[in-house]
Amino acid sequence: MNLKRVRYKQRDFSLDDIDELKQINWNLEKYGCGPTSIANVLVNLGFKINPIDTAKKILYDRNGNFDNTYLRNKGINSNGIIYCLERLIKENKINISYKIVKIDFSRPNDKKEKIISLMKNGNMAIIHIGPSEESPLSFSKNGHYLVISD
């Protein structure tokens, strides 16, 4: 395990200045695991970024207008993660590539070796577990994004 990695925690960041989030009772501290996961990967690849930066890429459109397209009741939907990465790659000139690997919980071993191989080669992954109704491994009724790495 690489103990020198930066490990942002979503509870340490706030978007209290965004009035639209107050109106829909959404906050980074409770529901920001997706933006925090993206920031954790990118900061450990050497990019200067934090969860507030990534959350704002999801929450505001390219014209700077608040846009809740990628929000769900208690978090960010999976399209929001991809949208954020694509915006960061294009707008912030972040030179990365990524793969999307979906694992069916009814057959989890199908991609497990692929993920293990990627980790052994120094890659990091953002994974989504849950919601708890679908996966007994999740503590969250809404699911949770997290980063796995060496």
Regions found by a protein language model. Give the residues of each.
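Active-site-adjacent structural segments surrounding the nucleophilic cysteine of cysteine proteases
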Residues: M1-S78
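Conserved active-site-adjacent core of cysteine acyl-enzyme catalytic domains
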Residues: D53-D150
